Structures are given as C-alpha cells and as structure tokens.
C-alpha cells in the first residue's frame, strides 16, 4: 500500500464545541446536546468517543466531519481537512453495484489507487465476493466492504460511527481485528464512536467519555494494553474496570 498522501504527522486535530443545540420542533423544546466539549487529537492515534446512548457522540462526529455546521465553536483539522473519510453505522453500499464497483466509486477515474483495489478486497476477506452485489452479502461482509472502501482512500482522518453495531460477537470481534490490522499497516488518525465499553478498550489508544445530558468530556483516559492484550478477554476486562471504575 502506498504511503499516506502528504500526511503532516506533526499536526494535531483541535476540537472545540462550545454549544450544540437541537432547535425546538412542534411541542418539543430546544435541547442543548453538547456544551464545552474541547480536546486535541494527536496524529495517527486511535481515539474512541464513548458514553451512554443519546449523549451526543454521533452529533459530535458529524460536527467534526463538517456534516453539521449549526454549532458554536471551532474544528481545526489542519492540513488533513481535505483527506477525511467517514464510515457510518450502515455500510451504505449502492445496491446496483458490485463490491468492486462500490469500492472503486470513491476514486477518480485513472487514480493509481484503483490498481490496489483487488489487493484491498483480498485483505478484507472478500476476494470471492468481489463481483457480488450487496444483497448477496451478509451484514458482516457488507461492513468488510465498507472498511475496504474507507481504507482504499488512504485518508489522513478516519471517522467511524458505531460501524460494528448489530453484529453477533464473533463477527464483531473478527471485524475489530481486521480494523486493527488495516490501521497498523496504514496508520491514520481515527475517531471511533461506540457505546460499548469493551469495544472501546479493545480498539482505542485513548478514550474520551461524554457525560449524559448536556454532554461534555467527563473522562480522558489512555488505554494501557498492547496488541496481544487487546485480544485477551481478561486483560480487556481488567483495563475496562480500571478506566471506568468510577462510572
């Protein structure tokens, strides 16, 4: 795989959301969702944003991605702002396109990365399904295709919003291991949203926990596990208890 496109490894991401409010609709009053959320992300780190359902995790990710501009604050992605990829909860594959075509569509015609698509499809375990349409794939296979499409772009920033939700445990575990393999071979800055604390420990180098209600950063913790320990259930549970002991 070719190196990242001009990655400035010395430039962190700066996030400041002073206020994010959902406007009043009908009988529903305006709702303050995020307040004074501020943090910095080092390049090529894997930061997990966690917290209870409905606390604003996905909203925060949408703001960082530039999909939601109705907020008070500032997002500074530095030179990486033009090299950002978002992997959503749903795989978002075009039903009329094959696995290969769904991956290729994110690249311009003639892009040299197009030559790497077959190898990427093989790496995510879909070599025999390259010409299959999404309806013929299991949800786990569709999410493998989504990972391939995200990493073929060689992004400098990768945002992931609960991409392994609704999967059985063996499938989710397999996909988490695949994600780590891809990330280690192609380092990039990852912001990963999940409500699953065990998943947060297995993946993150750092965890940001949002508080419920008018969410702010309630906890900022470093995960002290090596790669082997992340695959050890006992080690993950011990680290999970250490980090989340007071919550």
Each language-model region and where it sits:
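Conserved ABC ATPase "signature" region
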Residues: 112-129, 180-181
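A short, proline-enriched helix->beta-strand linker immediately N-terminal to the Walker B motif
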Residues: 152-156
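Hydrophobic anchor residue at the start of the ABC signature
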Residues: 147-148
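Conserved ABC ATPase signature
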Residues: 133-137, 141
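Catalytic Walker B motif of ABC-type/P-loop ATPase nucleotide-binding domains
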Residues: 158-162
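The feature captures the beta-strand-to-loop junction immediately N-terminal to the Walker
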Residues: 50-52
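Helix-to-loop junction immediately C-terminal to a conserved catalytic motif
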Residues: 65
